[in-house]
Amino acid sequence: DREGSLVIWTTTPWTIPANTFVAVDGEMTYQAVRAAQDGDSETLYIAEPCVKDVLKKGRYDDYEVVEEYTGEELVGWEYDHPLADRLAETADFAGAGEVYTAEYVEADRTGLVHSAPGHGQEDFARGKELGLETFVPVDGRGEFTGTAGDYAGTFVRDANDDIIADLDDVGALLASGTHDHRYGHCWRCDTDIIFLATDQWFITVTDIKDDLLDNIDDSEW
């Protein structure tokens, strides 16, 4: 068991209930930092290029680097979901709740990325590569299901503030703020898209094209 917290970041707090793994850059250097604030101290794991900026945002008074690791050395570390007490279920299956490498991690924010394969294309693809199940506590209406516990029945975007407040309440929020960035919107209704993995089926038409053409004359239109 290790003391401390993996400092992750996300622009979509509503996806945190679906967290399945934390992604790091395998070649990046990460530091275990003992950070002090108002007489108390805690150990935080942050990418080395991000340490000063992160601690500034967290309003820490002072810090010391306790140890350094490569991202590869963090792989396999297990962690507890910060909102487990608020949720009826979390991603609780083989491989979930661990650290993995991913190509989409960059040396910005904290260098550790919250990943929810049920709610993001890159996360989904990496989850499939890792053989992880896809955990989706959201229904087709964009509302949290009963598995989301305290947030059940809430439209996901309306839950952002509550999730941030709950993270703060359990002592798991380092900082929060607004951030301008590009995000997909529906071209019809001009609303931001909710990424949601769903069960679907597809037909490879090229495999049956000849049969389709042969049966045109026998079809009623």
Task: Report each predicted region and the residues it spans.
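Residue patterns forming the tRNA-binding/recognition surfaces of aminoacyl-tRNA synthetases
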Residues: 1-17, 36-37, 76, 108-221
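Catalytic alpha/beta core of large soluble enzyme barrels
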Residues: 18-139, 221
